[in-house]
């Protein structure tokens, strides 16, 4: 015999009017907020990733590829100097 945790059954929660009143507002709001976060470019600023037009500059058109095992720090410094 299984015990009772005192929580409402999931079927009761998703069939209640109160659940859908709350979530009919919050789910679209989260979607719109995420879309604005990405479309305005704020995601690039917050996470520090380069924008699509900043991957290759006028000075550096090659892919920044680390090729040496023992001088990798020097190569990273060389790549970051171009920014």
Swiss-Prot record:
Q: Which cofactor does it need?
A: heme b
Positions that bind heme: 23
Q: Which UniProt keywords apply?
A: Chloroplast, Electron transport, Heme, Iron, Membrane, Metal-binding, Photosynthesis, Photosystem II, Plastid, Thylakoid, Transmembrane, Transmembrane helix, Transport
InterPro entries tied to this protein:
PSII_cyt_b559_asu (IPR006217), PSII_cyt_b559_asu_sf (IPR037025), PSII_cyt_b559_CS (IPR006216), PSII_cyt_b559_N (IPR013081), PSII_cytb559_asu_lum (IPR013082)
Record's Gene Ontology CC terms?
chloroplast thylakoid membrane; photosystem II reaction center
Q: Does the keyword field hold Membrane?
A: yes
A Pfam family that this protein carries is Cytochrom_B559a
Q: Name one GO molecular function term.
A: heme binding
The residues that cross the membrane are 21-35
Explain how, and how many, cofactor molecules are bound.
With its partner (PsbF) binds heme. PSII binds additional chlorophylls, carotenoids and specific lipids.
One GO biological process term is: photosynthetic electron transport chain
Q: Where in the cell is it found?
A: Plastid, Chloroplast thylakoid membrane
> How does the UniProt record describe the way this protein sits in the membrane?
Single-pass membrane protein
Quaternary form?
Answer: Heterodimer of an alpha subunit and a beta subunit. PSII is composed of 1 copy each of membrane proteins PsbA, PsbB, PsbC, PsbD, PsbE, PsbF, PsbH, PsbI, PsbJ, PsbK, PsbL, PsbM, PsbT, PsbX, PsbY, PsbZ, Psb30/Ycf12, at least 3 peripheral proteins of the oxygen-evolving complex and a large number of cofactors. It forms dimeric complexes.
User: Which NCBIfam families does the UniProt record give?
Assistant: cyt_b559_alpha (TIGR01332)
- Its family? Belongs to the PsbE/PsbF family.
The record describes the protein's role as:
This b-type cytochrome is tightly associated with the reaction center of photosystem II (PSII). PSII is a light-driven water:plastoquinone oxidoreductase that uses light energy to abstract electrons from H(2)O, generating O(2) and a proton gradient subsequently used for ATP formation. It consists of a core antenna complex that captures photons, and an electron transfer chain that converts photonic excitation into a charge separation.
Protein name according to UniProt: Cytochrome b559 subunit alpha
Q: Which organism is it from?
A: Anthoceros angustus (Hornwort)
Tell me the lineage of the source organism. Eukaryota, Viridiplantae, Streptophyta, Embryophyta, Anthocerotophyta
């Amino acid at each position: 015999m299984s015990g009772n945790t005192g929580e409402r059954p999931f079927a009761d929660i998703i069939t209640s009017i109160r659940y859908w009143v709350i979530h009919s507002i919050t789910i679209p709001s989260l979607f719109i907020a995420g879309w604005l976060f990405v479309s305005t470019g704020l995601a690039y600023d917050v996470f520090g990733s380069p924008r699509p037009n900043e991957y290759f500059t006028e000075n550096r058109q090659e892919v920044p590829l680390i090729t040496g095992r023992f001088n990798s720090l020097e190569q990273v410094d060389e790549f970051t100097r171009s920014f």
